[in-house]
Amino acid sequence: MKKLVSICILVALYGATFAQNSIISITASPAEDTRKGMNISWATDKSISSAKIEFTTVRDSNWKNAMVKIFNGEYCATYDSLYSKRPDGKNFYEDVKINKYNAHIHGLKKNTLYKYRIITEEDTSDVHYFKTSGSKNWEACIISDFHAYAPLYHRTKSAMDMIGTVEKYSNPLDWVLHLGDITAWGGCYSFWQNLYSEKPFHNYMWAGVNGNHDNMTRTNKGNTNKFFRDAAAYPLNGYEGELGVCYFFKYGDVLFIMLNNENMRSEEGLQKAQEWVKRVVAENPAKYKVVCEHYQWFFGANGKDSQYPRWNKLFDELGITLALAGNNHIYASTHPLCDGKVVEPGKGTVYIQTTSSDNERGSACDLEKPIEYNGEKIKFRWTEGAKTISAMHMKVTGKKMVLTLLDRNGKILDITEVFPIKK
C-alpha cells in the first residue's frame, strides 16, 4: 500500500509539472568567456513566443538593479512523439511541441554570484543562480553516469545527494561538471524536464558532455546529438555538425574542451574532432587545458586501453593538462603520462575517469587482484560494484589543480594533483 501511495505521489508531482508551469527546463550553461557572460536555456509552451530573463547580483536583494532582456523562442519538436516512460512505469509517447530559448547574457561582472528568473505574461519562474569566473581560485563538483529514469527516481536522488556530499566537503562550489549519461534516454524530454527541477540545477552553472545514453532513444533508433544540444544552451563554437554539442569555454585559468564520442567512432570522425581540438588550443592559450569526453580512457576492471591510444599523442603534442571521462563506471586515475610513460608532475597529461553515481548501474571488479594491463600508468582504481556512488571535488589555484574522489559518505578515496605543463 505504501508503495502504491508513493507511486501516486510521484505521478501527481511529475505529471503536473508541464501543466502548472509555462516555463520549464531552466538551466545555466557556460558562455565561451564565463568572466563576462553566461548562457541560459529554458522552454515554454508553443503558445508563448517570447519571454524575459531578469538577472542581477545576489547582493541586490530587492532586484532594484536588475537587468531585463527579452528573447524569442524557437519552435522545437526534437523530442516529440518519442517512446518514453512515466514515473509509474507506464509507456507513453512524449508530446513535446515547445518553444526553446537559448539566451546569451553578457556584460556581467567577473567572479560574481548572480541570480536570475524567467518571466512570461502568465508566469514567473523560481529564482536560479550562477557564478561567473574571474578568480584564479575556484571549486567545482565533477559527477557522471546517473542515468535519470522516471520510474526509478532514486537514481537521480542518489546523484543529487552526492553533489550535496561534495558541497559539505567544500562549500561553496562555483559550478558542476558532468561527464555524460545523466539521462537513461536523452530522447525522453520528460527525463530532462524532471532533472532540471532538482536543486543543484537551480543553484549552479552546469557544463557537460554528450554521453551515449544522452544521445539515444528508448528504442535505440533515431539516436542523435540533438537531444543533448536542445536540452541546454552550450556555446556554438564547435565544428560542423557539432555546434552546441562539442564546445569550449574558459573558467578562470582553465580551458575546457568538450567532445562528443558518439561522432568519433570512425577514423574520419576522430580526425575531425582532433583537428578542431588543435585549432581551439592554438587560438585559446591557457595555463590549464582540460579535455572531456564520455568514453573511458582505460577499462577499469583490467586496465586495458580504450580511448587513451586514440588521443595520447595529440595530448602530448598540445600539452593537455588533464583528460576527464566517465562511462566505464569504475574510477581510475593515472600518473602524469607522456609518450606512453610515467613522467614527473607538470611534464605530462593526467587521465581520470569517474564512477557511476546512481547507486544502481555500477561495475564490479576485484580491486585486490593485480591489474592486468597498464599497471604502471594507473595509480588508483575504485568501485563499490553495482551500487556505486561517488563524485569528485575539483579545486583550482594558480599553482595546481587538486581532484579529490569522495564516496557517498564524504570519505576521501583518492587525491590527484595536476600541475600546469610548461612547453
Predicted regions mapped to residue ranges:
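Bacterial Sec-dependent N-terminal signal peptides
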Residues: 1-22
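Acidic, histidine-bearing metal-coordination/catalytic regions of metal-dependent phosphoesterases
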Residues: 19-148, 393-423
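Acidic/histidine-rich helix-loop elements
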Residues: 59-96, 140-160, 220, 230-237, ...
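Extended active-site neighborhood of metal-dependent phosphoesterases/phosphodiesterases
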Residues: 95-104, 113-129, 190-285, 310, ...
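Mobile, glycine- and charge-enriched loop segments
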Residues: 135-148, 269-306, 358, 419
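Active-site neighborhood of phospho(di)ester-bond hydrolases with catalytic His/Asp-centered motifs
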Residues: 142-144, 175-181, 185, 206-212, ...
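Core catalytic region of metal-dependent phosphoesterases/phosphodiesterases
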Residues: 156-218, 317
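Active-site-proximal segments of metal-dependent phosphoesterases and phosphodiesterases across multiple
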Residues: 263-266, 284-325, 374
